[in-house]
Amino acid sequence: MSTPSIPQFPSPFSPFSSGSQSTGMAPSQTVGLDTLAEGSQYVLEQLQLSRDAAGTGAGDGATSTSLRNSMSHAKDQPLFDDERNQSAGSGFKNTLQRDPLVEARSAIRKNSSSAPVRRRISRACDQCNQLRTKCDGQHPCAHCIEFGLTCEYARERKKRGKASKKDLAAAAAAATHGSNGHSGQANASLMAERTSEDSRPAQDVNGRYDSTFESHHISSQPSHMQHANNAGISGLHDSQTAPSHSQPSLGTTIDAMHLGHFNTLNDSGRPAMSMSDLRSLPPSVLPPQGLSSGYNASAFALVNPQEPGSPANQFRLGSSAENPTAPFLGLSPPGQSPGWLPLPSPSPANFPSFSLHPFSSTLRYPVLQPVLPHIASIIPQSLACDLLDVYFHSSSPSHLSPSSPYVVGYIFRKQSFLHPTKPRLCSSGLLASMLWVAAQTSEAPFLTSPPSARGRVCQKLLELTIGLLRPLVHGPATGEASPNYAANMVINGVALGGFGVSMDQLGAQSSATGAVDDVATYVHLATVVSASEYKAASMRWWTAAWSLARELKLGRELPPNVSHARQDGERDGDGEADRRHPPTLITSLGHGPGSSGINVTEEEREERRRLWWLLYATDRHLALCYNRPLTLLDKECGGLLQPMNDDLWQVGDFAAAAYRQVGPPVECTGHSMYGYFLPLMTILGGIVDLHHAENHPRFGLAFRNSPEWERQVQDVTRQLDTYGRSLKEFEARYTSNLTLGTAENEPAVEGAHLDHTSPSGRSSSTVGSRVSGSIMHTRMVVAYGTHIMHVLHILLAGKWDPVNLLEDHDLWISSESFVSAMSHAVGAAEAAAEILEHDPDLSFMPFFFGIYLLQGSFLLLLAADKLQGDASPSVVRACETIVRAHEACVVTLNTEYQRTFRKVMRSALAQVRGRIPEDFGEQQQRRREVLALYRWSGDGSGLAL
């Protein structure tokens, strides 16, 4: 079926009738311009100018007469002209047709007696919108230029309602059907859509109904066009109501791609028009010639006609001859008038800025591509890239130290994520969680103004992360939409309860098919929730992370790769290729003999190790925080390699870390959490086991009085002494040797990572600055390690529960263990003073440090409460240091238990200094009531209220 050619219409509002222009403007053509008016208000401007000129006939009678003659002449001209049919394919006007219109516009504006009416701009920039300031709509606007602000049009355009999925599927199916040899029917359908838009009652600029235009348009329309329109309308109606059997997978595929983010293009006085960005669809979904194959002369394209430096996020009319898919896929066709309407291309000032969320072809970090369709309505693309920078930003120029308090340790390599051409393949849930973590502390203007912006964005990112993660349902059945699809599934008499077991997984080795990325996503969620006031709720996410890590067998080394491509010894020579090779997502769970043929990169192996050791450390840390037993056992990771040095890890020098120990470490080896904090958590695990064995309701008393108890305590004490010696060796290696200049032959770790960590690191231009930064970082590590080591001594010898400690029913204060524990409490306070000297805001490890500061303070509170004015000066100084440390913690990572204990400690310190209140007994009782909220005895849950 051939599509009737659409003629090239004359210039509709030309006030002059030239010889070269043999036809005028038919009244029926006015309604036909509604399609153009959907994209811009250029035609409305021309109509307004013409009527203004007609109203000022006294000022310029010739112009008014010429305009009336032109309008009356247009009524007598036929709608189609053979000469114009021959040139209908041309999208450009010749000079004879263009110049009279330009001259007419100049004459009308020159002779208009009234002042120009200020037109309302279509959209204000983001800064003016937030500040509620008048904006001129330019890019950049005058307000932003005056105050030096960043002028952007990146926020989402609000809309009413959303496009129907049925309409999207029907339109895509119709386009695909047209590309398979039925282009004529597709043309008729699209023609019917435009005709249905044109068939609305004609309105002038003031909104009045013009019945003559409407009746003339209907009566003057050729019969063959009416027939085509009717056929197109009926065909479109059928495609919307009847299910599509020829393309069964297209609609479901589009639904699966979450095309829920639509940007609205609003024209004044016209209904909203939604347009979705389909660039995220895979090639298999799109038809061979694109979505517009049935209508190559589509007039809707996403371009910016104003300046070349601005993003391609504007809406204008243009031909798509170069790329038929351009109007739908957001590409930029050449700016010109469409061939079916020979109007001159209006100036950029006539285009209102219909801002869409751009999907720039020059994405700074291509790793974000999977999550871009989901975050388009939440944050701009540039902000997403900035948040990735925040996530990987290091606060130290010498050694890696995450600046975000919610990034407790680096699991992934920065270069793998931020690589410009070959980034790591990541799940959308992991990327969304990383953006959510970074948005908690980012100082981007988009998140700080207005003050409620951060909370709104973080809430949307959290909902997106959970939606993409589908908690506890890692393997949904095909076509199932609900995450709880198996909640009522019963197979062989067993209720599966919605924990990820589907019909096709019953014969698999495991019930979950989650990948390493899912575990990391759980870690991000759990970390932020743990740092909030809802600490008990964080255990849901931690438990899911620990369980999935155990199912993935992250505590075991993967079998070696099949070495058929390279001989022994050749792996180290191709380290660059290994670093650039994007690792695949590990979704295989049973790494047994049957899966030994899987080739896994060394980077992916190290990711698995670091993820396990991070979970291992947090398991022991939270066991102390929440008074709970251990989940991950030492025997599960006895053969797992210890994590490699963070600096070597980020550089990707896997060959330098080929020789490592296996099993949980007990010595300080580096500046990162894995180097100095993980060994302490290994020792803490033994202390936690002893604590719960001592308080066991049945075997606790017998174990406490047995020789086995003393032997276990001595073993843990030896581990603490070993850690203390390694800490001194570590300090000597990275302070004394560097100061004397004898560490030049050490592995180039101190400065090797400076080319990829942070701008501050890259700006260090001298060796002296790097050495001083390394020494400062080392002293902070030693101070934190010393403090936590003293606290572990206290936990091993003393009582964890503050109320039992203050009541002292068993007279533990008179024992030798109390004297030993008290000396460690003073030592911990001295280490805290050194920490405050090097890290005044306690931002080095705020997520972990709070509980150790609290447990190390209970003995000082006991001394202040019991001794009061008789306390020694060292105890008084220690109490003052603890109060200052808690005040710094409250500023950095504000939590309720730190605020509460600060008040309790200040009250006790006032009594030590002699300021005893009249209600002394009530003050002591109130302190005990406050401390009773946090119990570590019996069924107490510690900090988890």
From Swiss-Prot:
Annotated localization: Nucleus
Coiled-coil ranges from the UniProt annotation: none
DNA-binding region: 125-151
Gene Ontology cellular-component annotations: nucleus
One Gene Ontology term from the biological process aspect of the record: xylan catabolic process
Annotated segments matching region Disordered: 1-33, 53-74, 172-251, 559-601
Source organism, top-level taxon: Eukaryota
Polar residues composition-biased segments: 177-188, 218-251
Keywords, alphabetical: Activator, DNA-binding, Metal-binding, Nucleus, Transcription, Transcription regulation, Zinc
Function field: Transcriptional activator of the xylanolytic system. Involved in the regulation of extracellular cellulolytic and xylanolytic genes and in the regulation of the intracellular activities of D-xylose catabolic genes in the pentose catabolic pathway (PCP) in response to the presence of D-xylose.
Protein name: Xylanolytic transcriptional activator xlnR
